[in-house]
Amino acid sequence: MSHSTLTARREFLKFLAASPYVAAFGGVAAFVQEGVLAQGAQEAADVIADPARAITVFDFEEAAHRKVLPGHWAYMVSGVDDDGTIRANREAFRQVQLRPRRLRDATKVDIRVELFGTTYNSPIFLCPTGGEKGFHPDGELAVARAAKARGTLQFLSTSTSTSVEEVNRALGRPVWYQFYAPSSWGACEQMLRRVEAAGCSVVALTVDNTTGRLSETYLRTRPKDLQQCAACHQGEPGAASSYLTRPMYQGVNMAGALRQDPAMDWAFVDRLRRFWRGKLIIKGLDTREDARLCLEHGIDGILVSNHGGRATETLRATLEALPEVVAAVNGRIPVYVDGGFRRGADVFKALALGAKAVGIGRPFLWGLGAFGQAGVDRVLEILQGELRLAMGNCGTQSVAEITHAYVATPNWKI
């Protein structure tokens, strides 16, 4: 949109906002005022050419959009079906209000958190996302270097475009490994032995996407990229053949195996629990019933997740599901959450509802796609800074002090 068009639109909205006729209708006036604010934000947010110019994580979105190939961009931003769950994830934050306590010392706000015995500089972690080289040539290594600089936990996807060994070296400590369980137990063992040998002690079994998905936007846009990056799109979506060239499948016997086992059940979880000697998290649960089963089956943690709205069109936000999962485990195991987090205040709300740590996905991919390591680093800097502001303004000096008393929630009971 040209500068002259933006200016004309701004002046028209200002004219409407000042009109006594519009003012007579409160709803219309509010709508027009929102338009003025949105227009001002759009003008202020010219596409950034330097990550240092970013004020919020949203500033990276258009910058990344202009650099990332169309099919890869569609893969990053789209959900499933009508993308309703993506919208639900964001809309939930507007339903949770902060309840600040005043007259409290905010000179020393500590956002550090300990997760399974390791201290991180904040409760914000980087979610597993597959094939990060599709967004920037340095891919997972750029993300790892930024995570190291910011003292941040990094998950690594089974669908990574960089090996776990390389990422661990760049990060300076082991990642938490997100595990897509193949339909062959032998393949599971081979992959997990490699992960263990690389020094990883935490595995997150993903359970919310075992039968595939309908990603409409991605599927319609992907053919535009085939001439430019055919290596990224081998085989049919979801088939094991699509992933055999990825690093974590090298040396793994996937003959006749599916990338994810559609027959996976709690008996499989028990078998995995007996085999894996480290910490085992289940990623993708969002009900109290499944949370209680985690306790029965010896699981060490739960990641409340709907795959960023990319698995099942539940139309239910992870922030809404979080309280019932937290209540079900009653402090016996930690609960983590991801899905739609864009602000430090969003993170604060999840911590108040009982999350131990909070994951981000698309925001750091925007940073990666726009500026590589520097973009990811700035995204983390912004969110950590916003979290400090939210904590200080609400009267909390440490993450441990953030409780349900600091938020007001709607009736989300089932």
Regions found by a protein language model. Give the residues of each.
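N-terminal secretory signal peptides and thylakoid transit peptides that target proteins
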Residues: 2-20
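An N-cap/entry alpha-helix motif that binds or orients negatively charged groups
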Residues: 44-117, 215, 224-264, 400-402, ...
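Conserved, mostly hydrophobic/aromatic
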Residues: 69, 126, 147, 205, ...
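Glycine-rich active-site/cofactor-binding loop and its immediate structural neighborhood
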Residues: 120-157
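Hydrophobic faces of well-ordered beta-strands that scaffold small-molecule active sites
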Residues: 124-127, 154-156, 175-177, 203, ...
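Glycine-rich beta-to-alpha transition loops that act as phosphate-gripper elements at the mouths
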Residues: 158-160, 281-288, 334-347
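Alpha/beta enzyme core
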Residues: 192-316, 321-335, 353
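C-terminal helical cap(s) of enzyme catalytic domains, especially alpha/beta-barrels
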Residues: 324, 369-387
